[in-house]
């Protein structure tokens, strides 16, 4: 997909769009980028998990770095389901990728995930 086609594909998404509908468009972008079906499934599930953590229908433009960090903290300490360091690292990558894509195509002015610290797995 050319940059022009990618920009056109996000033209229906705005700062007021909730995360879930935007994720559906992002899924096609990931596929066009040659990501494997397993990667796409995991990345989409990770971002949808963030969406389910946030207030219902939270607009993309209202998501903050603080909320993303709270989500990741909850993921590690309060979710009640173990989250391995490798899984946590992938979830951070997924969220960063999603918001970077939105920022790259002008949907959001500020990328709230840019300042989220990537946790490496050794």
Please tell me what each predicted stretch does:
Residues 4-7, 24-38, 44-122:
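N-terminal core-binding DNA-recognition domain of tyrosine recombinases/integrases
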Residues 10-20:
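A detector for short, charged/polar N-terminal pre-domain segments
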